[in-house]
């Protein structure tokens, strides 16, 4: 098996530190808002990685953290007039609901930053002892970036060309703009913990270093996350972990490509996010999972209704091939499974793996046409087993196909309403009335208001 290592910028033969066992840490959510489908892509990608590694016989320890104390949590809690702890707890429950709705496997361990404050303090003290950290004039403790000679090795940037990143705060207390905070001095009304440097709370980056190493040891096999975390977050994790423990942090780094809308990254700051909950109102979970895994995990992926519809049609082909076949035990594998493994062993090449699944669909249909039902059923069982790695083909064919028809009907209704609104905007009342009649024939009642057009099925 070969996996692309962001640290070396090349595919490497994957050999776990301990034979047969894989220790994987993935950066989780900062719990102050709803998860959007950009997060969902990263979660589903690493869900696929865990499922595949386990299918290949590895004993995987999967750790994904929760950041439950952060500037954004404190700010949002203040706006909502609730405590940061209450806000975090509420969104942790929402996160778990979304995780279940996405069919994402729960991590083996899900540490919260607030549970690891003693370990964080211990690591900061090591950095101070090793002279990689200092206390600023404002009482915050900072990491001395220029003291760590390997800084920039993950993002492949030279220190002299680096600028303070989006999540690196500017402060007069820093020796260098790139220095980042390890411990923030307490402010009135904020959550705080005792430390040798006074009351305060951890910085964002140090949390992941302390949690991952405390649970998995150092070094461990794979650290994953979205591409947007590569710099400065993951770069800072390497610096503080290796400076503190004086040994390598992680063997292999994996980064999931970003989800884009109109060629822009999906992010809260750009205001173009679509929550998981909104997406699942529009599309079945299998359609969403198929779409999010259809491109190679390292590449950007463009979110659009057209791409989701292509995903629905693709799954329809799978389920039509499975419909009406007897259910048999999956006992034997064919060359299709070997070729599937070959694709997935090449840096989790899901586009090639999906192409192979479509080959299996065509073969199943050929067996059907030749009335070789037993052969079709055996291959269908193999197809379902491989589909499970992607969290797909979990419905009965009848269940999915009935739901897909309803989804297609809704999309058709929305399309007609959009066309009618365009006609009304052009004052083409004849066309608008014709479309209204079409909708009436479909059993759809529409109501126009200043907020737009609403509809219901009668």
Curated annotation (Swiss-Prot):
Pfam families the UniProt entry points to: CysS_C, DALR_2, tRNA-synt_1e
A Gene Ontology BP annotation from the UniProt entry: cysteinyl-tRNA aminoacylation
Cofactor stoichiometry and binding remark: Binds 1 zinc ion per subunit.
Entry cofactors: Zn(2+)
MF-aspect GO terms: ATP binding; cysteine-tRNA ligase activity; zinc ion binding
Position of sequence motif 'KMSKS' region: 265-269
SMART domains the UniProt entry points to: DALR_2 (SM00840)
Binding site for ATP: 268
Keyword line: Aminoacyl-tRNA synthetase, ATP-binding, Cytoplasm, Ligase, Metal-binding, Nucleotide-binding, Protein biosynthesis, Zinc
Binding site for Zn(2+): 27, 208, 233, 237
HAMAP family in the cross-refs: Cys_tRNA_synth (MF_00041)
NCBIfam families assigned: cysS
Quaternary structure annotation from Swiss-Prot or TrEMBL: Monomer.
Protein name (Swiss-Prot/TrEMBL): Cysteine--tRNA ligase
Gene name of the encoded protein: cysS
């Amino acid at each position: 098996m070969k996996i692309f290592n962001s640290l070396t910028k090349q595919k490497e033969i994957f050999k776990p530190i301990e034979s047969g066992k894989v220790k994987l840490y993935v950066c989780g959510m900062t719990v102050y808002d709803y998860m959007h489908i950009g997060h969902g892509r990263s979660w589903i990608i690493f869900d696929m990685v865990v499922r595949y590694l386990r299918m290949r016989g590895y004993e995987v320890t999967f750790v994904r953290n929760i950041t439950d104390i952060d500037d954004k949590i404190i700010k949002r809690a203040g706006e909502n007039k609730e405590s940061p702890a209450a806000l975090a707890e509420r969104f942790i429950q929402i996160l778990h609901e979304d995780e279940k709705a996405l069919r994402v496997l729960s991590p083996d361990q899900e540490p919260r930053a607030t549970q690891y404050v003693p370990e964080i303090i211990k690591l900061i003290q090591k950095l101070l002892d090793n002279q990689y950290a200092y206390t600023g004039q404002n009482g915050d403790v900072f990491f001395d970036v220029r003291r760590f000679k390997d800084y920039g090795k993950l993002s492949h940037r030279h220190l002299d060309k680096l600028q303070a990143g989006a999540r690196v705060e500017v402060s007069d207390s820093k020796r260098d703009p790139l220095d980042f905070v390890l411990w923030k001095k307490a402010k009135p009304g904020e959550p705080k913990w005792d430390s040798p440097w006074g009351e305060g709370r951890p910085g964002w980056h140090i949390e992941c270093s302390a949690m991952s190493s405390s649970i998995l040891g150092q070094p461990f096999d794979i650290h994953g996350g979205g591409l947007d975390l590569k710099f400065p977050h993951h770069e800072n994790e390497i610096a503080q972990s290796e400076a503190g423990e004086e040994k390598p942090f992680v063997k292999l780094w994996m980064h999931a490509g970003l989800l884009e809308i109109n060629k822009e990254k999906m992010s809260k700051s750009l205001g173009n996010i679509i929550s998981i909950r909104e997406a699942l109102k529009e599309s079945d979970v299998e359609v969403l999972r198929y779409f999010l895994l259809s491109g190679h995990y390292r590449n950007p992926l463009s979110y659009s209704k057209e791409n989701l519809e292509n995903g629905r049609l693709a799954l329809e082909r799978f389920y039509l091939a499975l419909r009406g076949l007897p259910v048999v035990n999956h006992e034997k594998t064919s060359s299709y499974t070997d070729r599937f493994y070959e694709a997935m062993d090449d840096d989790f090449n899901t586009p090639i793996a999906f192409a192979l699944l479509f080959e299996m669909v065509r073969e199943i249909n050929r067996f059907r046409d030749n009335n070789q039902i037993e052969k079709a059923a055996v291959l269908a069982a193999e197809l379902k087993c491989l589909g499970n790695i992607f969290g797909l083909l979990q419905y009965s064919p009848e269940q999915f196909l009935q739901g897909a028809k309803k989804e297609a009907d809704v999309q058709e209704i929305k399309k007609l309403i959009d066309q009618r609104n365009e006609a009304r905007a052009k004052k083409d009342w004849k066309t608008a009335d014709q479309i209204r009649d079409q909708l009436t024939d479909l059993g759809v009642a529409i109501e126009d208001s200043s907020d737009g057009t609403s509809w219901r099925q009668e």
